[in-house]
């Protein structure tokens, strides 16, 4: 099993911790309610959020273009990320609700116990080898959030973690 830039413990992702703190009086239901009203997270909101988390990239983009004007590979990577961000889909209603409530607010993913109706998936019981990747430059899945898998997948015969030098989108 492989996980690339996957936040396995959302307590290490600042924007989610802020959301939890702000909605604590409603036990997280304020965000769940908004997700239901909007049918999930609309694509323009997802796109704006991804760009906002990498605001430094946006500010530095003109200098990056000038610095790499003679490097077609660097410019192609930048354009690929821009195209990806411009076409990002939204998150559908039920999926976004489950992710918010179970993964983020209640921390099920971090504990390794996912609830799907009457079923419980115990991630700590996975025995297959696992390869994880994380980056200190990832604004979406902070390095500690991705590295959490080293402790989480304790039933695996082998868990390897590799730190890469890249943003969440490459």
Q: Where do the model's predicted regions map?
A:
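Active-site nucleophile elbow and catalytic-triad environment of alpha/beta-hydrolase enzymes
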Residues: 104-122
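Short beta-strand/loop motif that positions the catalytic acidic residue
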Residues: 126, 132-134, 138
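Short acidic (Asp/Glu) and glycine-rich catalytic loops that position anionic groups and cofactors
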Residues: 75-82, 128, 163-166
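Catalytic histidine neighborhood in serine/cysteine hydrolases
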Residues: 146, 151-169
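Alpha/beta-hydrolase-fold enzymes
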Residues: 1-94
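Conserved alpha/beta-hydrolase "acid-adjacent" motif
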Residues: 139-145
């Amino acid at each position: 099993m492989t996980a690339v830039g996957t936040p396995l413990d959302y307590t290490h992702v600042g924007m989610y911790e802020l959301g939890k703190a702000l909605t604590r009086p409603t036990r997280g239901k304020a965000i769940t309610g908004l997700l239901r009203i909007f049918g999930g997270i609309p694509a323009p909101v997802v796109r704006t959020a991804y760009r906002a988390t990498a605001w430094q990239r946006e500010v530095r983009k003109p200098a990056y273009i000038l610095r790499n004007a003679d490097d077609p590979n660097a410019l192609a990577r930048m354009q690929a990320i821009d195209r990806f961000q411009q076409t990002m889909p939204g998150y559908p209603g039920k999926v976004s609700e489950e992710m918010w409530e179970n993964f983020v607010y209640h921390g099920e993913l971090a504990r390794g116990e996912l609830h799907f109706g009457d079923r419980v998936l115990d991630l700590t019981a996975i025995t297959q080898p696992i390869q994880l990747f994380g980056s200190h430059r990832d604004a979406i899945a902070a390095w500690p959030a991705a590295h959490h898998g080293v402790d989480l997948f304790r039933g695996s015969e082998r868990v390897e973690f590799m730190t890469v030098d890249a943003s969440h989108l490459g």
